[in-house]
Each structure stands twice: as structure tokens, then as C-alpha cells.
Amino acid sequence: MSRFQRLTKYVAIGGGAALLLAGAAYLAGAKVNTTKSIPVGLYWKSNAPVEKGAYVMFCPPQVGVFSDAKERGYIAGGFCPGDYGYMMKRVLAAKGDEVAITDAGVRVNGGLLPHSALIKADPSGRPLPRYQSDSYTLGTAEVLLMSDVSDTSFDGRYFGPVNRSQIITVIRPVLTW
């Protein structure tokens, strides 16, 4: 067997093993985030309760704002109903919290959230949706899903509260950068 054939054989075996390992990790609960909405990195599915501060993975509801977002490329296609890809965000408000969404940003119980000022247009100049709420108290089944690390995330400031039933799982960071 030539040197090239041996090298090809080892690369193929190594590549196959890496694919099997990645598939097993995914099935066991590993999730990779490559967006700016939460810190980039490796996350693990958790049975923890959905509460303020938790990172979650959710399926967008089948409503117009998400259809437009998918059409514009803000969210990907995937395996959620409506052919949406799942999204990862942080729960920054929950039951009983007072939420106000204005041009200045999102306030929860009077405090302005970082990175929450509304951006009027996307990089292509298209107007972004606007969820306007001067004051709204979240109900039992509602959460506000936001980014607390990115000014440009497509999050609750544009689509408003989400029903807890849309949440697939809580995710915990394993390795982020």
C-alpha cells in the first residue's frame, strides 16, 4: 500500500469517527450556537426549569413576524413547525414582570436592558418589525426572550413575548468564547 493510500485510509477513518462522535453528542444533548444572540459555543440540553436568566432553545411560533424574518434570512429553515430553525435566546422577563418596549430599548420592571435599543432597519436598509408596548405585564405562560450580548440580535424587542410552550429546552453553556 502506498503512502498516499495509507494517509487516505487514516483520514477516512478519522473523519468517520469524528462524524460518529459528533452525531452521538448531538443525540445526547449537545448544541452548538454560532449566532450573536448568546455567547458562541457549545451548550448542553438541560432539564432545568425555564426561569429568568436561563438560556433556552425554542421554535418560533408560526406568525407573520417570524415568516418575514425567515424570508429575509434573520432565522434559518429547520425542523420546527413552519420549517423554521430553532432559536437560542436568554429569558430576561417572565410571569408578572412589567415590560416596556420603546425606541430607547426594553425595560423590565423599570430597568433598561443592555443591548436592547431598537434598530430601525437591517443592513440591507429594510425596516425591521416593531413590537410596541409602552407597558405590559407578562402572563403566566409568557416569557421575553432576548440577547444580552448583541445589539443586532433578532429578539423580543422585535417579536414581543413568546409562549412557554414554544420552548424546547433549557440549555447550559459548556464552552463559550
UniProtKB/Swiss-Prot annotation:
Listed GO CC annotations: periplasmic space
Biological classification of the source: Bacteria, Pseudomonadati, Pseudomonadota, Gammaproteobacteria, Enterobacterales
BP GO annotations: signal peptide processing
Function: Required for donor-specific phage sensitivity. May be involved in pilus assembly.
Family, as annotated: Belongs to the peptidase S26C family.
Keywords assigned by UniProt, alphabetized: Conjugation, Periplasm, Plasmid, Signal
GO MF terms, alphabetically ordered: serine-type endopeptidase activity
A Pfam family hit: Peptidase_S26
SUPFAM superfamilies: LexA/Signal peptidase
Protein name per its UniProtKB record: Plasmid transfer protein TraF
First and last residue of the signal peptide: 1-30
Subcellular locations according to the entry: Periplasm
Cross-referenced Gene3D superfamilies: Umud Fragment, subunit A (2.10.109.10)
